[in-house]
Structure formats: C-alpha cells, structure tokens
C-alpha cells in the first residue's frame, strides 16, 4: 500500500473468498498411486496428502508428498527459500551428475522422495500478520552414466572413458518466519530463514580397467535475516533494507584409486548489508539516492592427503574480509513517448587478506543508461549501455590444491583480481493485443577485461585447473527473439523463439595460450489449437547446434533436433485421454547421430465429483539410454545417461 500511485505491478491481484460453509473446516485432498516399472525393476508408488483450514484468526496449509516415480520434490523446497545470493560462493567438491539438456529431469531421476511441509498465517490487529513455513525433505536417488571426455591438446588429444553408478542421500530442513505490516503510511517486513542440508554421494566408477570409489559429504548450513521498510512522508519515498547472513560448509571427499585420498574443506562466512533509499517525484522527473554499506568476514581452510608433494601445496588457510560503501544516484524521466533512466553506482572496497602483506583499497564505478522510445502505441525501441567492474571473486581466492573429484585438481589465485565489463544492447518490442501478435527482439554486445587467466595442465593421471594473474579479454554476442501470434482459425496460437550466443575467449593449455570460440544456436517453434470441446493439441519443434573452434586444433559443430507433441481428448463427459510423444536426434560426434523416441499415455475417469481414477503408461517403447555431447573449454564430453524404462501407474484422487 505504501507504493500506491508510485509503483505498478504487472502481476494480477487475486482475491479468494471462501463459502461460509467452508470456513473453519479442514479441506483435504488425497492422491494415492501404485504401479510397476521395467527399470528400475521394482514397484512404484506416488502419494500426496493436502490439508487446508481457513479461520479469521489463522490459516494453515499442510502437505505430505512421496514418490519413486521420478518427480523431483527438491524444487518445491527450494522455491520457499529462493533468493538472491549476495556472496555467490560455490562448493569446491563437485562429484554430482550434470543436468541433461532438453530432456525432462524426471526421465533420468531414479528417486525415493518424501516431503513434509506446513505453513501458518496469523492475522493480527492493525494490518499486521505473522507467517511461518517449515519443510523437511528426505531423498535418495541413483544414476547410471557413461562419459567419454576429450581434452583437445596441441600435441595429442587426451580421451578419458568412464562408467559410473552413483547413490545420493539428501536431507534438507528449511524454515521461514516473517512479520509483515502493510499500511498506507509504511510497509514493514522481516524475514528470518534457515536452511540445513546434508548431501552424501557414493560413486563407484570404472575407468578403462581401473576401479574407483568416491565418497563425498557436502553439508551446508545457512541462516539469514532480511528486513525491508518503506515509508511515505509526504511526496518523499524512503526505504531501508538490511540483510544479515551466515553460512558454513564443512565438506569432504574420499577417493579409493590404488591408494586412499582425502580432501577436506571448511568454508564459512558472515555477511551484512544495509542500504537506505530516498526518492522524490518532481514533475516528470524521479530522483533517488541509495547509499549503504556491507561487510564480509570469511575463513576458508582445506587439506589434501594421499597425493605426492611434487604436485604442489596441499593446504589452504585463508581469512578474507572486506568492508564496502555504496552510493547510487538514479534519475528517471518520462515525457510523452520518451523514457530514460541513468544510474551511476559508486562502490568502495577495503580488502584485508590474512595471507597478504598489504591490504587492498578498490573503487568501482558502474554507470548505465537506458532509453525507450514509443514510436507508436504498439511499438517501442530501446537502447541500453553501461560499464561495470565486478568485485573480487572470492571463490577463486586460494593458493593450495583442492581436489574437486577423483581426477581433477584446482588451484586459485592468492591475490586480488577484478573483471571490467562493457555492454551495449538494443532492440524493439511490438504488441497488438487485438490481433494477438507479440514480438520482442534484443541484440547485445559485451566485452570483458579480466586480471586473471584460466589454465589447465596434465600431470600423470590428474588434470590440474588453475588461475594465473595475467590480463585477458573476451567478448560476446547475444541475440534473442520471440514472436507469438493468435491463430483464430485453429482456436490456438503459434510462436517461435531464437537464442544465439557467440563467445571469443582464451585459456592456457600446457603453458601455451590458446584462443578459442564457442557458439550455440537454439530455436523453438510451437503451435497449438483446439477442436471444439473434444480435442486440444500442441506441437513443438526445436533445432540447435553448439560449436567449438580453436586455432589449428579443433573445429567442431554438433546439431540437435527435438520434436514433441501432446494432445488431450475428451470423448465422453467423464473420460480424459492424454497422449504425449518426443523424438530426439542428437549428433554425438561428427555425422554420427543418436535417435530416441519416447511416448507417454494417460487416461482419467471421473467416478464422482470428488473422485478420479487415472492410469498412466510412461516410455511405452521402453527406451533405456539418452545420448548427447556438449563442448567446454577446449574439451568435449559425450554422455550416455540411463533413463527410466516403461512404467505403469494407477492413481486415485479423492477430495475429502
């Protein structure tokens, strides 16, 4: 309410009103299902229980979900705690499976999942309310994969073939508690969040004739408090935000490969950020000034045992702190068909490194400008340009070796390094709601200048990735476009999306600096329609390629095709039939394609207004492998992933 007449939302408001007979009563939904599967060769289950009660003083929603059918419940937990990560730290140990492009995640997820969630809302006097949310997830998943990795080298390419089976156990407990006041004079909200997760991964591998075992323990503990205040004193608008966050990651990796190798890491930090914003509207001009400060206190320790000392230092013990001040003036102007915005953030960082003899003082200036011209009520052109300097990447700030998986070692920098960027983008947006035609096109060019250079060396059976303090440049082209239009004669619509990315960069490979280019194109066309009340249908076709070019070493380009369709038929009132199919054609190496066809079917029958019975048949043709190849930094990885086999599932849905 405090932003009324100042800020507009594109999200529609939804007001729900319960019938009198439904108030103060529990509303419950139950879903229970069972079936069989060819891979994994075991029984299937799927269950959901949803309970809700609405009272004048309080409201509650509680649910329990469980399945082993490939439905990912982890995303539902992450949605509750999702938010911007100000520190952007990552795990140093990384032994998990990579995501599969194009293919739905449930196809490759062999899981056994349980999720419990309960949320409460208490309404207080004077437009105050209290909310709480608690979630607990228990998940066990397995995966089977084969990979063939090629590292392109000036002398002779190195090829590594792996077969692995993994078992992952995850326990995650999240809690969210908030207090909110929404008044015309001010808005106040305080969020207290915590996330405790335990992730254990066991991997048995076969590389050529060698047997390898990996055991990774990756717990992560996080607590944060976020305060937001908005006030409207007259024509002025004042806001204040405060974020305090702490995180601890005590993680370990154990490798059995001829001998025992142990990697331990401890990464912990406390981060605080406070910011105030004062703005005023002066005719067509909006003027605002934001200022604040932040601080980070971080310790990183690691130790590596079981490798020869000749590879390098095996210990890290770093303390990295910084204090920062920020000031951001902003101007916004709107006159008839013209709009413009200017921002000029100025930041000061004081870094203190326990391992360095001197501290570091850094000033960062990141101005940007945005202009929009409405040539007609339906069409506008836009232009955006700016400069930016990113602060030090703390994740790469270490000097000793860290084992990320059984074969890969990494080494960072022991001194400050920054990345300076420039960008220029422009495009247009056209919308004609009457005819149902919408178009958006954007072209962006960017340049990056970095103080650090990534490199890769090979030592016996290990691959060492590292950073060195050396100036390097890269540049990128990005083109995005989308067009959608109503098709009245089909009672549907059609559209096309295009994404093109081209990047030029360099790296050090075995002491030689090598320039390379990567590119990708992804286009998707779609069309859907309806025939009376009987049939709904849709068809989608996607084409893409990814490319890797390196001077005198490699010039590769691989293509991918995907066709998919879905249709829903209602032959009689109580019967609903759904069919869905996918055809993938992936080029895994030059002129060698792998094809796979997947077909699913589902039939639902409404027994009563509160009861429905459904039968689902997944992967009708019982396909077992999905193959694809992706390019990296002077490397390519050919993947073969095991997918879920033919499955039959019966579900009963009851509304109590």
Task: Go through the PLM ranges and name each one.
Residues 4-6, 73-79, 142-158, 200-209, ...:
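Outer-membrane beta-barrel translocator domains and adjoining extracellular loop/strand segments
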Residues 121-139, 167-205, 211-356, 374, ...:
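Face-selective signature of the C-terminal outer-membrane beta-barrel domain
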Residues 522-545, 551-656:
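Conserved C-terminal beta-signal and adjacent last beta-strands/turns
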Residues 417-423, 443-483, 514:
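Signature for the C-terminal beta-barrel architecture of outer-membrane proteins
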Residues 1-199, 214-243, 277-289, 335-338, ...:
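Membrane-proximal, glycine/serine-rich, low-complexity loop/turn segments characteristic
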Residues 47, 105-107, 327, 412, ...:
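Residue-level marker for the onset of beta-strands and adjacent loop->beta junctions
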Residues 26-40, 60-64, 344-352, 412-414, ...:
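Transmembrane beta-strand segments that form the barrel wall of outer-membrane beta-barrel proteins
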């Amino acid at each position: 309410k405090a932003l009324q007449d100042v800020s507009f939302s594109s999200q529609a408001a939804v007001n729900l009103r319960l019938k009198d007979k439904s108030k103060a009563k529990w509303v419950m939904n139950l879903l229970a299902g069972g079936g069989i599967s060819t891979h994994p060769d075991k029984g299937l289950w799927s269950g959901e229980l949803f309970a809700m009660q609405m009272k004048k003083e309080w409201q509650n929603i509680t649910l329990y979900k469980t399945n082993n059918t490939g439905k990912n419940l982890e995303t539902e937990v992450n949605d509750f705690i999702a938010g911007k990560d100000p520190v952007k730290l990552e795990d140093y140990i990384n032994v998990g499976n990579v995501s599969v492009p194009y293919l739905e995640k449930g196809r490759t997820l062999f899981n056994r999942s349980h999720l419990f969630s309960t949320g409460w809302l208490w309404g207080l006097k004077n437009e105050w309310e209290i909310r709480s949310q608690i979630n607990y997830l228990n998940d066990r998943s397995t995966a089977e994969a084969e990979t063939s990795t090629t590292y392109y080298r000036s002398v002779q390419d190195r090829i590594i073939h792996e077969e692995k089976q993994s078992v992952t156990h995850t326990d995650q407990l999240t809690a969210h508690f908030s207090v909110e006041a929404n008044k015309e004079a001010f808005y106040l909200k305080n969020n207290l969040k915590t996330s405790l997760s335990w992730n254990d991964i066991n991997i048995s591998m076969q590389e050529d004739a060698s047997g390898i075992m990996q055991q990774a323990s990756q717990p992560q503990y996080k607590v944060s408090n976020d305060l937001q205040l908005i006030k409207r004193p007259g024509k002025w608008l004042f806001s204040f935000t405060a974020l305090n966050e702490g995180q601890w990651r005590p993680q370990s990796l154990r490798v059995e490969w001829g001998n025992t190798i142990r990697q331990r890491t401890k990464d912990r930090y406390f981060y605080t950020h406070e910011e105030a914003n004062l703005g005023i509207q002066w005719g067509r001009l909006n003027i605002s000034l934001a200022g604040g400060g932040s601080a980070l206190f971080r310790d990183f320790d690691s130790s590596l045992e079981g490798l020869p000392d000749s590879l390098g230092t095996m210990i890290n013990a770093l303390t990295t702190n910084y204090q920062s001040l920020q000031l951001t003036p902003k101007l916004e102007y709107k006159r008839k068909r013209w709009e413009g915005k200017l921002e000029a953030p100025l930041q000061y960082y004081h870094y203190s490194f326990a391992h360095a003899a001197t501290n570091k003082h850094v000033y960062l200036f990141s101005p940007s400008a945005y202009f929009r011209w409405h040539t007609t009520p339906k069409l506008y052109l836009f232009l955006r340009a700016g400069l930016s300097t990113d602060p030090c990447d703390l994740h790469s700030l270490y000097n000793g070796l860290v084992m990320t998986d059984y074969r890969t070692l990494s080494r960072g920098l022991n001194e400050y390094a920054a990345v300076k960027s420039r960008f220029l983008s422009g495009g247009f947006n056209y919308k004609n709601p009457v005819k149902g035609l919408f178009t958006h096109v954007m072209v962006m060019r960017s340049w990056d200048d970095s103080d650090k250079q990534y490199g890769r060396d090979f030592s016996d059976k290990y691959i060492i990735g590292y950073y060195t303090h050396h100036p390097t440049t890269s540049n990128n082209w990005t083109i995005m476009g989308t067009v959608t239009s109503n098709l009245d004669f089909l009672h549907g619509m059609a559209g096309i999306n295009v994404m093109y990315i081209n990047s030029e960069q360099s790296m050090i490979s075995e002491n030689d600096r090598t320039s390379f280019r990567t590119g990708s194109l992804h286009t998707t066309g779609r069309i859907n329609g309806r025939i009376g009340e009987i049939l709904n249908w849709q068809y989608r076709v996607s084409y893409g390629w990814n490319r890797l070019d390196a001077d005198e070493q490699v010039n590769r380009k691989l293509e991918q095709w995907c066709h998919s369709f879905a249709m829903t038929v209602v032959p009689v009132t109580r019967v609903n039939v759904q069919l869905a199919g996918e055809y993938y054609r992936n080029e895994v190496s030059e002129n060698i394609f792998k094809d796979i066809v997947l077909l699913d079917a589902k039939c639902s029958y409404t027994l009563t207004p509160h009861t429905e019975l459904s039968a689902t048949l997944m992967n009708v043709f019982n396909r077992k492998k999905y193959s694809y190849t992706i390019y990296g930094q002077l490397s390519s990885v050919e993947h073969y992933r095991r997918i879920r086999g033919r499955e039959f599932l019966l579900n009963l849905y009851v509304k109590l």
